[in-house]
């Protein structure tokens, strides 16, 4: 795998009612190879108010070259005004898994 095709992990919190549709859309479009969905409880401030919400955390794996397209897709499908979308590079991993992520995501938008 070329260095330009490194893998990233994208984290996104989303209402539980939207998580399956979001995960399915990202995988079916081949923007990501895999999405894990984990129930979480989020505490934060929004518009000056303390908030707490049950949500789902999506953990998506994709190629670095697909990160911006994935973020754009998440933004377009997400119901929040300012969704949490964070991409972090994978600095090491099991080579066969990383190769699988590379193979299962499309090469360009």
Task: Tell me the role of every PLM-derived stretch.
Residues 1-109:
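Positively charged, small/polar-rich N-terminal and surface patches that mediate targeting and assembly
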